[in-house]
A protein has these predicted regions:
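Short solvent-exposed strand/turn elements
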Residues: 166-171, 241-243
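Short histidine-centered loop motifs in beta-beta connectors
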Residues: 156, 161-164
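A structural micro-motif recognizing beta-strand termini
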Residues: 107-109, 163-166
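Short beta-strand segments enriched for Tyr within beta-sheet-rich domains
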Residues: 91, 169-177
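RNA pseudouridine synthases
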Residues: 1-146, 152-155, 233, 240-255, ...
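Pseudouridine synthases involved in rRNA/tRNA modification
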Residues: 1-23, 176-260
Length: 260
């Protein structure tokens, strides 16, 4: 049987014997998962085990689930799933009222020497090769967006950064990283050549992608959620994904685990 590349055009199905290792927290109301960076959140045409929600339904045997916070396919890390509508509303309200602090870990191209706050509005880019791409814009349709980047480790080629999105726009971290001139490593859309995304969609992983991308997916990981509820704070953390961990071990001389 041909082995499927998890970061290829056609990702493999979820192995339910491995699924329990993704669980960060579970009780009768919540399921918090550390999603791998090759899996879509929403159900797809390829069956229940082709998506995170489908795998969760298989695991919990619940038909009704509430995806409180989702991630793009190639972003790893925390995904919050509520098992009851009332719990979903509680968490969604906290997000809407900005009673939550989110922290991501990102590997950026280039040496970001000091922390910076990016306060640049974001809009959909109407023209261009990649139709789903957003960009920094002062157009009237643009929405305000604020992201804070704090370097943890830096060498000549890469930076491991803590990233704090203070708003929740689509692709916000990636758009702001591109605007700064320090795109996320492995980003096919907001990296140095967006035609790589088209090639990936049409052909899967190719030699040209291998030559131009330092990772097979975007090096972005949702690391922490800290909620401020009336009945007390709640924090969830997801260990860094294995592929990003391996990249850091290879490219940074310092012990990056001491910096997180």
């Amino acid at each position: 049987m041909k082995k499927i590349d998890p970061f290829g055009k056609d990702a493999p199905l979820v192995d339910m014997t491995v699924f329990p290792s993704w669980i960060v927290f579970e009780d009768d109301a919540l399921l918090i998962l550390n999603k791998p960076g090759w899996l879509v959140c929403h159900p797809s045409k390829d069956g229940p085990l082709s998506s995170l929600v489908g795998a969760v339904r298989t695991y919990t045997k619940l038909d009704k689930l509430h995806l409180v916070a989702r991630l793009d396919r190639e972003t790893s890390g925390l995904v919050i799933i509520a098992k009851r509508p009332s719990v979903a509303r509680k968490f969604q309200m906290a997000i809407q009222e900005r009673k939550v602090e989110k922290e991501y870990l990102a590997i950026l191209e280039g040496a970001l020497e000091k922390g910076i706050e990016v306060n640049q509005s974001i809009a959909h880019r109407p023209n261009g090769l990649v139709k789903i791409k957003n960009h920094v814009s002062d157009d009237r349709t643009a929405k305000s967006a604020v992201t804070v980047f704090e370097p943890l480790l830096t060498d000549e080629a890469y930076t491991l950064a803590r990233v704090f999105p203070e708003t929740g726009r689509k692709h916000q971290i990636r758009v702001h990283a591109e605007w700064l001139g320090y795109p996320v490593v492995g980003d096919k859309i907001y990296g140095k050549d967006e035609s790589l995304y088209i090639e990936f969609i049409e052909k899967g992983w190719t030699d040209r992608l291998n030559e131009n991308l330092a990772m097979k997916r975007q090096a972005l990981h949702c690391y922490k959620y800290h909620f401020h509820f009336a009945d007390g704070p709640v924090t969830f953390e997801a260990p860094l994904a294995e592929d990003m961990d391996t990249f850091c071990q290879k490219n940074f001389k310092e012990d990056f685990s001491l910096s997180i």
